[in-house]
Structure formats: C-alpha cells, structure tokens
Regions:
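Pre-Walker A-like glycine/lysine-rich segment at the N-terminus of P-loop NTPase domains
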Residues: 1-60
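C-terminal lobe/lid and adjacent interdomain/linker elements of RecA-like ASCE P-loop ATPase modules
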Residues: 1-4, 297-366
Length: 366
C-alpha cells in the first residue's frame, strides 16, 4: 500500500505538498476503509483549480519510468511549475509492502528525464544516486567498478531500480519485486471530454467488443440495473459481433446510440472493475462528473469494497457522509495542502455528525 506521497515543483504545486495516509484516526465505524493501519479508501474535495487532477497524476508519475504499462502521451507537457522551469520536480513515495517500508525518492527534469534517485528499505539505504554520484549497497548487489561507474554516469537516464531488476536474479518476495508488482498494478483514469488512463494495462480496448468477447453481456446488464436502476435488454450476441445491441420492442438498437453520457461513464467503470482484481492502487479523477448524486454513492460503495486502495476526486459533497466513509478518509485540497477532515478542525468528529453540513458551513480549515 502507499502510505505517503509528496511532490514539489510539479504543475501547479510550486511548494512541497504532502499526502499522508499512514495515521488514520481511531474511529470504530467504517473500519473497512482502513487496512493494516493505512487509509485504504478516500475522496478528495477542493475548489476548482486547487489541484485534484494534478495530485492524482503526480502520484502516478512513477508508472512512466518503472513500468511498460500504458502512459498518457502528453503527460510531460506542462509537467513542471511554470515559474521554475530550470528546477527539478521532486517526488517522494513511501510504501508498505508486506512487513517492509520502502521509501523511493527521485527528481526529474522538465522533459521527464530522471536525474536523481534514492531507494531506502527499512531505514537502510539501497542506493542513492544524485547527479553523477552514486552510493549503493554492493553487499546486496555486488558489481564491477566499471558497472558501478556506468550506473553513476547514467547517460540514458534509466532508473537504477529497473537496472537492478533486470541485472540480478531476485526471488519473488524481494522488495524490488514487490515494488515492481505494486507499481505495475497502479491505475489512474478519468472520463470527461475524452477517456484517459495511466497504468495497469498495456492495450487499449473497444468496450463493446471487450464485453462481448469476455461473455459479460448479461453481467453488464445486471450491473447497470443494480447500480443505476436502468433496465436494458441486450440482444444475445452472435459469433464475431462487436457491437452491443438492445432489444426495444423487437428492434435492435446499438447501445452506444441510446446510452446517456452517464451510462457511457458507467460502462467504462464496469470495464475497469473487471481489471481491478490485479490492481493495487486506483485513482479515479472526477469519477462522478456525469452521475446523479445517489448513483455516485452506489458506485463508491462498490469501489470501496474492492481489495485494492481506491481514491477518487469529486465536487459532490453528498458523498461526504459517515454512512460511506469516515472523517479521516475525506480529504480537502486547498492552497497547496491536503488534509483529512479530522485534521481540519479542533472539534471531535463522531459518527452522528453531519460532516457535509459542517463542510458547507466552513467548519473545516486547511
């Protein structure tokens, strides 16, 4: 699980912003939102322009250089804070991987090239690469001086994590393997004017074709009914069909034509839910942009029941309720800071509090 993330000089974040998930409160309700002492589920709120999208994408920067998973083509446009174009963007990650704490820090130039990189496991420095200087644990990773010098120079700006992964035989439980597996399972996506995603998959799919090919037509029909109350009757697909058809009084009408924007968004969500059994960390940006507030609540319940860490961003304060999460799982992002509700007030928050009403009444200060 990811327990802490920090970034500096990234897009709109001129100063360092820290998102700490490692200190949940001791609430006795909705305990499923906490796992192994770490916040497992959460929703990020904040005014327009506060940086919710930027924070989500910043967390997933690590996917760009540690995996071969799908990447956002224009990610490095507007990558660095406009007022400090010559500086580096600094990233800090802390993971809880089994019983080990893994800290991974790195810096990138404005074009995304990796400049500095450091890995610490349980307070032991595995390597520390700053510019052309490299300190590395040669007991764990024995190497010839020429090989070490090549790593230090790193003319191709390749991650040392990846070099070690490909150069040494490591057992499955090794911390580098666990780190790789976690990052491989990270997924960010959104569905606004266009559909975009980062991580988890290497391919792009046509949703109709995927649902038909996987034999999920009936399950998708049931999903729409349970989550949104919409009752579609899909035509049983023939061999080689690639388009979902709905039966309307004997007429076959393409689902794509009659589905609303919100229903199309649900279709994308359904697709990703099929993939989330192998996910480790999911961030859905503006997940409910096209959802009725009650539908958004039902979708959240389904997402937060998954085994992986799931976070969303939203403007829908109907979701800010102790019936869904807890005060330590609702975050406010404002003025280059992100804090949970319980850290934004001196009042003791309890299950019976109407935290949405308190939020609208400006009871929480970041």
């Amino acid at each position: 699980m990811i327990t802490r993330f920090a970034v500096k000089n990234y897009r709109g974040f001129a100063d360092k912003i820290v998102w700490d998930l490692s200190h949940p409160s001791s609430y006795s309700f909705n305990t499923n939102a906490i796992k192994d002492g770490v916040v497992k589920n959460g929703i990020i709120y904040g005014p327009n322009g506060s940086g919710k999208t930027n924070l989500g994408m910043a967390v997933f920067d690590i996917v760009n250089h540690l995996t071969q998973k799908f990447k956002k083509a224009d990610y490095y446009k507007n990558f660095i804070y406009a007022g400090r174009q010559d500086n580096l963007v600094d990233f800090e990650y802390t993971f809880k991987l089994g019983e080990q704490e893994v800290r991974y820090d790195y810096s990138k130039a404005r074009d995304g090239k990796l400049i500095n990189e450091k890995l610490v496991v349980d307070d032991n420095v595995v390597f520390d690469h700053q510019g052309k200087n490299l300190v590395i644990d040669t007991k764990s990773f024995p190497m010839e001086p020429t090989f070490k010098e090549g790593l230090a120079q790193n003319a191709n700006h390749v991650s040392i994590v990846n070099v070690l992964l490909t150069s040494y035989p490591l057992v499955e439980g090794h911390y580098l393997m666990k780190l790789k597996n976690f990052v491989d399972g990270m997924l960010w996506f959104r569905n606004l004017d266009i559909r975009e995603f980062i991580g988890l998959e290497t391919n792009v799919y046509v949703l109709d074709e995927y649902i038909i090919k996987k034999g999920l037509v009936d399950d998708f029909q049931s999903f729409l009914a349970k989550v949104s109350g919409q009752k579609f009757t899909f035509v049983k697909p023939e061999k080689n069909d690639k388009v979902l058809l709905c039966d309307y009084n004997g007429e076959k009408i393409p689902f794509d034509i009659i589905a609303s924007t919100g229903t199309h968004s649900l279709m994308l969500l359904y697709f990703w839910i099929q993939k989330m059994d192998k996910a480790t960390l999911v961030f859905i940006d503006e997940f409910d942009a096209f959802y009725h507030f009650e539908l958004a609540f039902e979708v959240c319940k389904r997402l937060f029941a998954l085994e992986c860490q799931v976070f969303t961003s939203s403007h829908n304060t109907y979701l800010m309720t102790n019936d869904l999460l807890r005060p330590d799982c609702n975050f406010i992002l404002k003025n280059n800071e992100i804090k949970s509700l319980c850290d934004c007030t001196e009042k003791e928050l309890r299950w019976g509090n109407n935290i949405e009403k308190m939020y609208r009444g400006k009871a929480f200060e970041v």
